[in-house]
């Protein structure tokens, strides 16, 4: 009997709180029907305004190498752009080495990313690996020296660190499209990308401590941010591999799709991004990275703010006054609260 009274009392208190929170004018019948909007209902309203995301097959056009010396084509990568769409795709093309990178690979990747950045028709970039067995297996250990990785007749270097920074600073989203192994330095490459879409055969993990290597930069800090410090320690200290499903659960990737749907789904994400404001996306990427990138991150965010300011009448007044050798008149611009 006492339990029944306590339950009734609790129900009455809950009813009082509920009635207090419901706005005036709501009838009890309407209040009972209030619930969170479902994803499907929100999607329906969105689609009425914007329409469905196109699902037609993308047409890729190969982009020729425009670089140094006698080399007229890329050797270690394939660089393509979608016909009449703002999507670029950069593919590491060393499947015989599980798409491991060497210094030449990194140089070509950086040239392609630079071109995609400078091309105003490109809004999103896909990074992937040739074939279905590996996205990237990291640095090619056969070319590793005491000075880093060295191509024949070249000095050793760790130029992949420059590539990591380039991807982070690039003012357009980069999506890692992962099939097969993303391990070692390849695992770090997908982490520095903005989004990761994985096939159901994808495998993730770090190998460094097994082969006498490590990444104490982005490979540690970004991983800790993505999966938490404890899980990051597990991944580095134990050098275990994780399935795509496990990676999704720990927040390491965004989604998992069947292997046969990988490119289709990735292109769909690209098309959704391309619907949105490129300036908003640019500044958001800089802001999201700034917290982890210290002064360099703040510099990137500040640079974006400067570019936006250059497009205002206030900035134009300052430049025009200087060019005309007169004092600027900033009094006509509001000092917003």
From Swiss-Prot:
Keywords: Isomerase, Lyase, Peroxisome. GO terms for cellular component: peroxisome. Its cofactor is hydrogencarbonate. InterPro entries: ClpP/crotonase-like_dom_sf, DHNA-CoA_synthase_MenB, Enoyl-CoA_hyd/isom_CS, Enoyl-CoA_hydra/iso, Enoyl-CoA_hydra_C. GO terms for molecular function: 1,4-dihydroxy-2-naphthoyl-CoA synthase activity; isomerase activity. It holds the Pfam family ECH_1. Substrate binds at residues 97-98, 133, 137-141, 181-185, 207, 213. It catalyses: 2-succinylbenzoyl-CoA + H(+) = 1,4-dihydroxy-2-naphthoyl-CoA + H2O. Its main location: other. Changing residue 20 to V: Loss of peroxisomal targeting. Hydrogencarbonate binds at residues 206-208. One of its GO terms (biological process) is menaquinone biosynthetic process. The record marks 215, 310 as: Important for catalysis. Involved in the biosynthesis of phylloquinone (vitamin K1). Converts o-succinylbenzoyl-CoA (OSB-CoA) to 1,4-dihydroxy-2-naphthoyl-CoA (DHNA-CoA). HAMAP family: MenB (MF_01934). Homohexamer. This is 1,4-dihydroxy-2-naphthoyl-CoA synthase, peroxisomal. It comes from Arabidopsis thaliana (Mouse-ear cress). The gene is MENB.
